[in-house]
Amino acid sequence: MSEPKAGEVFRYPFLWKRQDLQGETEGRKSRPVCIAVTIANANGETVVFILPITTQPPIASRHAVEVPDIEVRRVGLDLHVRKWVMLDEINTDIIERSWVWEDRTPMGAFSPAYAAQIRASLLALAKAGKASITDRLK
């Protein structure tokens, strides 16, 4: 199996920051997520930065990008409900040691252009200190 790449969409038990702060350690459900960035750490392991995809419209104080219909089709999600990639909440995981990520079969992948838009928006938010990270291996 190949390593996940930026722009690929998987099912993953995403842990929201509010759940993490309440002491929860596992996501409540497996949901579609997008791999935003992958990097190698000092040990040569693959760190993935994971963003949730939701059908809940973001409130005004949140940061998200709506998923266009063509991208929804590319990854095989339901077209009858609008979707957003949340940019201000990130899970980080290490591929080689993840104990929560069971099914690593991609559902599909966003186009390179849309994946680049997600990545650029995420990096801008992170630089501005407006993105929170939940480390799934802590």
Predicted regions and their residues:
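C-terminal terminal-subdomain/extension
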Residues: S2, V67-K138
